[in-house]
């Protein structure tokens, strides 16, 4: 089987055997998605590039421990998001004071406006567009900026319980819209 | 010891669990519950799928062309270090030719001195770059602070600027107080320009009369932010538009507008 037709799991297995061609193929297949998510979350080209490299290097180094239990792309993006959140939280700890939080919030909000411009992402775009704005904003701040619920509550000057409920409702609605949950 | 979670309560916590928004103690409780509850594990999977879709729905951007080769070089280098270091250090190697050993030591000293000089120069250069970057960040933060103040003001009016071409993703928002000449412009998805080009904001009066609203550039992602001090209050203007112009700006627009919006009623 040539590289182009290899499954992600077989590429991971070859990476565990230190086959650079497998890494090259895996990178070619997923680099765009990883870089795009990193860029959306970090907002800086250089940082997103470094983070993408870190993620693929981590995959390369720990390929031997990979357990194929679902889509490798989804797993890779979870890894990317976790690393980006670590960075964002480090930034916030460095800048932690009352006056900077609203600025970060302000910086965070434009990203959702540009979300999902490709045709194949239409369903996600529609589902997001249908969410009430306050739910969408809270979900974006939690998901793409890694803000804790307490930080979102402080930024939006909204009670913590309300923020939790908004995020939960947003996810429930998205789940219903995207997965056609029975009874909806 | 805390009582085990009920399924209803666990399901309530699942979204927070996936968003890493739970306290460590609650994370442990949910993890423990999930290890024994098939139903909640299924619920978790469905939420996980939604978040996965969200992660894949971001605007897609090509990574820099050199990233692939950089990654491969780092991976191969890392592998060689791990694999070859033990082999490259023979256990019983002894110096066999003393004059060569002395020569190598001298050469190493010269390299070290040169290296120290280079390192000092490099650190000084880095410090200057960091200082410059810090000043840029401060300027940017001041601008954002003003934008946030404007957003929070009850009398602020947002004006959305769009392209005349429906397929263009370029858009912007102008935050203004109609009775005042100050405003903040935020744009997204405008094509980045060459060094000798710039974007220019036009504030249209009646007919073909217009004021210059200022020039700005956008970053690699097409994002830009500009503070505006117009020659008159915004009630005087009927429309706004942005065009691409030579660096430094033009006395009047020389290209079709990229995005714009009417201001009537402000």
What are the residue ranges of the model-derived segments?
Chain A
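Short, charged helix-capping/linker segments at alpha-helix termini
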Residues: 2, 16-25, 35-54, 160, ...
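Internal acidic/polar
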Residues: 4-5, 94-121
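A short, charge-rich alpha-helical start-of-domain segment used by transcription regulators
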Residues: 13-36, 60, 124, 136
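Sigma70-family region 2
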Residues: 16-17, 40-45, 54-71, 90-91, ...
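Amphipathic, Lys/Arg- and hydrophobic-enriched alpha-helical face
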Residues: 27-45, 62, 128, 173, ...
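Structural recognition of an alpha-helix C-terminal capping motif at a helix-to-coil junction
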Residues: 50-57, 70-82
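Arg/Lys-rich amphipathic alpha helix in sigma70-family domain 2
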Residues: 61-68, 78-99, 117
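DNA-recognition helix of helix-turn-helix
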Residues: 74, 81, 85, 89, ...
